[in-house]
Each structure stands twice: as structure tokens, then as C-alpha cells.
Amino acid sequence: MICHSIVCGRFKLMAHLFCPPPKLHYLCRMKTVRPKKNLGQHFLTDLNIAKAIADTVDACPDIPVLEIGPGMGVLTQFLMEKDRLLKAVEIDSESVEWLNSHYPALRENIIGDDFLRMDLSRLFGGRQFVLTGNYPYDISSQIFFKMLDNKELIPCCTGMIQREVAQRIASAPGNKSYGILSVLIQAWYDVEYLFTVNENVFNPPPKVKSAVIRMTRNSTENLGCDETLFKRIVKTVFGQRRKMLRVSLRQIMGDKAVAPEFWQHECMTRRPEQLSVAEFVELTNLVDAALKSAV
């Protein structure tokens, strides 16, 4: 494939000759918005990767799309080609100004706000939507916890995050990467680790590799246990992940006098990374019953 270099100020970027002018225009404007370390901004500069990320939303057709942290719109421009209702949330006022100037067709749908503080039910009038973006590393886990809190609104979430976080989300039981995010997300979503992205396609380059994932709501409507207790147990036992459950669960059971059979259950000699989502549901029901019958 034939490529050529475009030199824009301090940045030397690669663009394919077949890229239409608007996309090359984006590259030559890279210097107009300064990436801000406090916001965890790493602007993607590879158009092929941007298009590949945009294409991941096709798995959930016919519903609106919400992009988080569009920056200067390298992903936005490809999402706009999807002919779907698109809104973008950007906390950086400089980026909002740039987006309004260069994407006038999207101006009414560019929201200058903090995604983590927003009421998502108001975004599309209560309609479901796809969540996507080149997510800031610093808050990616918080974004996914908010997704879980709004899972009935978000049947599909795609995008790019730190590779280590993506590996945790997609990890299976028995793997050292398996943890809180793995269990809580896999309880409600099917997870696909799509591809890895190298550091050199960002400005500034991050110190770690990135990855693109897709999470699609599974058929689970009810876990079959107390969901609040389920989350509490998952977070508690992974907080002491190297200890057996009979040790870490004492933080939840406290001084309550429970039946001896509870502590003799076969799962008590296992560690949290050895339990599947279904086994965590079973454990939650076991703990729930023990707490209710405790003296």
C-alpha cells in the first residue's frame, strides 16, 4: 500500500494517498489542540485504526451512537459516515471549540460535559444507544462501571482502552488478569478482544499499548441473586485475591454466628480468580442465606 508523509509543525504523520481531503485536513490541524495530561488525552493519529474502531459499532445497528472524548474528531469523522444519530461528549473546552468549528453539521450534538456526571437517560430521550470512543486511560474503569449502572440503555459498548484493562475485561477464570471488571462486566456482556494498537499511533505516545474491545449485552435479565451483595462480594474478595474465600469473606460475615456448614462449603478453599460468574452467583446466594439465618 502506497503511503506518503505529511509534516505538520512538529508532527510527522503517515496518511494513505487515497484518504479524502477532509481526513488529511484533520492531520494537518493536529497542532491546534494541545493534548492535556490531566485529562489523559492521547490523540489517535492513524486513520485506518480510527475507521476500524468506528466499524465496531456496526454490530449494534439502527440505534444512536454516543462517542466519549472525541478530541479533534479523528474517530468522529468516520462515525458521521454511519448515517446514524451521533452525539459526542467532550470535557475539554478547547476540543469542543475545535469540533464546533470543524464539524458544523454535528454542532448541536457536541456536548461539553463530564460523561461520568451525566444522566444518560436524557441523552436520547430514554432510547438505547451504542457507547464508543478512544477512552481516557485514567477513567476507563469508571466509564465501564457507569455503563453497568446503565446497562438497560447500553446494549453495546466498543472502543479503545489500555491493553492491560482490555485483557482484564476479557479474561477467563484462572487467569491472573481475571478480576473485578472481568466478573462484573461478563455477568451482563459478552466480551470480544478485537485487536492491539501500538504506542506510536498517538500524540503524545502513551507508555503502554492499547486495545480495541467490544462488549455486547448477553441474554441475562436477572442474575438470580441479590445484585448489590453480588457486587460487594466480588469487590471484597478480589481486594484480597491471594487469600482463600474462607478468609476474605469474613470481612462481609463479620462476627455473625453462621452455621458451621457455611465455612465447610467446598468453595471456601478456593481463591476468587478460580470462580466463574455463575459460581459467584452461587456464592452470593450462599452468603445471603447464611446472613439471613445468622444469629
What annotation goes with each model-predicted range?
Residues 241:
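Primarily a LysM-type cell-wall glycan-binding module
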Residues 16-236, 256, 273, 278-295:
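Catalytic cores of RNA-modifying enzymes
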